[in-house]
Amino acid sequence: MVPVGTKIISIPTSTTEQPIQLSPSPSDETISNAYAVVWVDSEDKIIVRKPAGISGTAVSELAYDQRGIILTGSSTRLGSSTWVEIYAPTGGTGWVNFWYLTEDVPPARFCEDLRVNALLETFVSGLINHDGETLTRVVNPKRGLILRHDWWNPEVLYSTSSVSSIYSDLSEIDWGVLGGSDFHILGSFREIILPQLEDVFLISPEVKCNEMIAGVTTQVAVWPREFDNMNFYVFHRPSPEGGNKYDWRTWAIGIEYVENQPYISVLIQYRGDI
């Protein structure tokens, strides 16, 4: 199960690699086995139910930014969704849809994890070489790869099985609309998204961990609230010195852990608007 409104995409050369400079890590610590809530709007909550399923009785609830959730170890498959049993914050146990949980990794520990550095370097290598197989290895096996042309535009989801063909598939996709207009952004990943990724990653961008970098814009550039518990890296190409102050671009990469291994879940673009 994926969030309502998410567009699901399922689709049946080489240059010199430029390393991205990331903060060094002193250690590779064991990640906590607790979970946190993701993909829930700041105005919403997750209902904890018993038994599992949307028809189960509500026994508790989780806030959109709830952390420290412990699983009992029991799970069940209901249709296309996996439900897991948790220890409810109000006591006892109950069930929630596993899509809305992520392994709870403290931000400071995340920013010191050397495996994340290696993950991002592999991602950049796959991007530079247009290598879908390499990209597949770094994408979240639980979710696939989710992209937003702009942070406020709808999500487009590439299933795990379709990521390997992301560079070669030319199917037209609706990526949302241009800011302040009804003009839809239509085209393939290769036509629309790839040039905008290369605009940032083929240079030596500014890099921050769990911190946004943005230039001049009429809309505040923010990491979406529904991803408050998801760690991220930001890569920023500033506007040219003495040039158009709106001509900048940032890509934020949301990273989650699956069985204690980091994977890329989300790519979100930020850019100047006039």
Positions of predicted regions on the chain:
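Boundary regions of SH3-family modules and the immediately adjacent low-complexity/disordered segments
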Residues: 2-32, 87-111
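Short alpha-helix capping/helix-loop boundary micro-motifs
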Residues: 52-57
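SH3/SH3-like beta-barrel superfamily modules
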Residues: 61-99
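Sec/Tat-exported extracytoplasmic proteins
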Residues: 66, 72, 123-131, 139-143
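Short, low-complexity N-terminal intrinsically disordered segments enriched in polar/charged residues
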Residues: 103-125, 129, 137, 148-151
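Short solvent-exposed beta->alpha transition segments
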Residues: 117-118, 136-226
